Amino acid sequence: MLSFSDTFKDGVYFIGIGGVSMSALARLLADRNVHVRGCDARESAFTLKLREAGIPVTIGEEAITEGTIVYTEAVDVHARLLEQARMADKRLLTRAQLLGMIAACYPHVLSVAGCHGKTSATSMLAHVFLHAGRAATCHIGGEDLDFGNYYATGDEYFLTEA
């Protein structure tokens, strides 16, 4: 099993950190003592929550010093920040690749996939695990009324929306 601190020892920078999934992944890594920061094109409720959690967020572009850059598929692969990261030989990961790396750090993974109902099903699983007293980290692809988009009580299970 991989460790977060070894896998991301040079920090992680998120391009598009204000999205529902990216902000949850940023909080998850920050909770595991990984240096995290990022940027987004616009302010959102998620960027405000990240700042409240102590994660630096820039609106617009800035210099990237972290060793790993994560971007969403919504970001143009020829975007200036990604081109600069390639030139600096940084490790580039899509959100999906990062999600796979994070899942590899857990002994048990439950991933909800499909066309409709993923967020609802993932949220329901999070509630089931909470009420069953099971140690789980939950990456929810939307806003659960109780948990928001991220919830963690332990590292035995990783619940995620694929």
Which sequence ranges carry the predicted segments?
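Structural motif
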Residues: 11, 67-68
